[in-house]
């Protein structure tokens, strides 16, 4: 009987734990599919990145390298990292911890006959209103880059 009383008495404490908001480190993504040829998508991404005044800092052709190492039919997977130093400075002036969101990173790969383009976005719902405003503007530009590359 005492055991049951202890269990029932602890239920509000246990339930209150589940009511606590969970801190999430999840990064929102924006993804678009296209029927455009893979290499054309990569070229269009490079153009769109440059038109938005970003500079490509790295391009990793992961699928190609895996094929070169013997996996003949391995599909294409690419990552393109890019940055705009003026925007980076603005973001870091707002919050130095935002360095974790840099550089911007787009991934492309093929699946089920389509080319997928995926980019992680900056969180817009943090505690810093200035950073949220900055993130919303950046996310608009990042989506425009992806959409440009995906549009036939």
For the regions a protein language model found, what residue spans apply to each?
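C-terminal partner/receptor-binding element of secreted or periplasmic proteins
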Residues: 122-152
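Compact, glycine-rich, soluble single-domain proteins
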Residues: 51-52, 57-104, 122
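N-terminal secretory signal peptides
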Residues: 19-75
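Beta-strand/loop substructures that line and gate deep hydrophobic ligand-binding cavities in soluble
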Residues: 102-128
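Bacterial N-terminal signal peptides that target proteins for export
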Residues: 1-6
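C-terminal motif of bacterial Sec signal peptides marking the signal peptidase cleavage site
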Residues: 15-16
């Amino acid at each position: 009987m005492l055991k049951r009383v202890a269990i029932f008495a602890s239920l509000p404490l246990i339930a209150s734990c589940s009511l606590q908001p969970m801190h999430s480190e999840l990064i929102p993504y924006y993804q678009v599919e296209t029927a455009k040829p893979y290499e054309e998508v990569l070229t269009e991404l490079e153009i769109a990145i440059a038109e938005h005044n970003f500079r490509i800092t790295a391009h990793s052709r992961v699928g190609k390298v895996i094929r070169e190492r013997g996996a003949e039919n391995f599909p294409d997977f690419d990552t393109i990292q890019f940055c705009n130093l003026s925007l980076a400075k603005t973001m870091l002036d707002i919050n130095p911890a935002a360095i974790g969101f840099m550089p911007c990173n787009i991934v492309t790969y093929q699946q089920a006959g389509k080319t997928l383009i995926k980019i992680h976005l900056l969180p817009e719902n943090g505690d810093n209103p200035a950073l949220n405003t900055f993130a919303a503007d950046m996310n608009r530009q990042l989506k425009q880059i992806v959409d440009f590359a995906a549009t036939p």
